[in-house]
Regions:
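Bacterial N-terminal signal peptides
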Residues: 7-16
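Predominantly soluble domains enriched in secretory-pathway, periplasmic, or organellar proteins
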Residues: 17-350
Length: 350
């Protein structure tokens, strides 16, 4: 009888906890060691871990908040996870080394590399990758499109060598991707996959990585990782401004109002905040080591960075930069998004 009572109480507690979590804003963090962790955003208490396989990378959440899409490098798959049950409902074969994921209108756009040319670091590595790119057997990366409602691939778009960041035009008709080894940003028609334009970035700096559209749709910010630069493109996809940043810029986003630009500095262990009009540096938010990706909370009061080398999550006050929480997170945290969706290096606010 006591055992049965304990079981009932435990079950009730779990149901209450699940219902509570479902009604509260949450953060999803991908870990390279093979799992996704879910946290309550108000206090960053962990709710659950979901095993997905080694190399969990980019993520995106459906518009209704019921499905989480996760790129898993080791399996070459996009996994669809039912958030309420925390069960994997679908495995979709994508290709080698799937990494970046963006969701638009319940379609997941997933970058992968058929040639499996892995990312490297440093100028020598960049030169070697260019040589590999020029080889006859080099294959451009691609962006596959998956319908989150049906779980089926509906398109496959050829990009460039080592595609990294993904963004969309304000009208939802164009796809912009940063091609690291090609040293360009390519723009494609989403409906047809046709290449519209290429923006050469190497004259301004090396290794384009992150890309994010301003909320008004008039500009795009692109990080040039090996040159400590931030490139600003106008809505016609022309270079408008070049801004110097701190050491090794990676993930980037605008705030929801479009008044500030946030840039993750992988080696400087900080997030640099710029005025979106004057491009003056407004403040520096200290984080951890190799924090490639970050998000703002839905109300934008907090910034949360996933720091892969220091194995922690850093929660900071967005305005003051004060560290509110430093959460040990072994397993090499890679990316972070929230639901309700908020602006960050991997997502945008609906």
């Amino acid at each position: 009888m006591k055992t049965a009572l304990k079981f009932l109480l435990l079950t009730a507690a779990l149901l209450v906890h699940t219902a509570y979590a479902a009604n509260k804003p949450v953060a999803f963090v991908s870990f390279s060691k093979g799992f996704i962790s879910i946290y309550q955003l108000d206090d960053m208490n962990k709710i659950a871990d979901i095993e997905v396989g080694d190399g969990a990378r980019g993520m995106g959440v459906s518009d209704d908040g019921k499905t989480l899409a996760v790129a898993v490098k080791s399996a070459g798959e996009l996994l669809l996870i039912d958030i309420e049950s925390r069960k994997i409902t679908k495995r979709i074969a994508v290709g080698k080394n799937p990494e970046f994921v963006r969701v638009l209108n319940d379609k997941a756009f997933v970058a992968y590399e058929p040639s499996n040319q892995m990312a490297a670091t440093g100028a020598d590595a960049a030169h070697q990758k260019k040589k590999t790119k020029d080889d006859d057997d080099a294959t451009p990366a691609r962006v596959t499109v998956v319908d989150l409602k049906t779980g089926k691939k509906i398109a496959d778009i050829e990009a460039g060598m080592e595609t990294e960041g993904i963004e969309f035009s304000a009208d939802g008709q164009s796809l912009l991707v940063t091609n690291e080894s090609d040293e360009n940003v390519s723009i494609h028609d989403i409906a047809t996959g046709k290449l519209i334009k290429k923006v050469d970035t190497k004259k301004h700096g090396l290794r384009p990585r992150g890309i994010k559209r301003a909320p008004d749709g008039n500009t795009f910010a692109v990080t040039l990782e090996l040159s400590d630069k931030l490139l600003i493109l106008n809505k016609s996809f022309e270079v408008q401004d070049i801004i110097s940043t701190g050491n090794v810029p990676y993930g980037v986003t605008f705030n929801a109002a479009g008044t500030e630009i946030y840039v993750a500095l992988a080696k400087a262990k900080a997030v640099q905040v710029f005025d979106a009009k004057s491009y003056a540096v407004k403040r520096l938010i200290n984080v951890g080591e190799r924090c490639w990706h970050f998000t703002l909370s839905p109300d934008e009061s907090k910034l949360i960075a996933a720091c892969g080398r220091s194995n922690n999550l850093v929660v900071a006050d967005t305005q003051s930069g004060k560290i509110l929480q430093d959460i040990p997170s072994p397993g090499t945290p890679w990316g972070i998004i929230t639901y309700p969706r908020s602006t960050g290096s991997l997502d945008f606010k609906k």
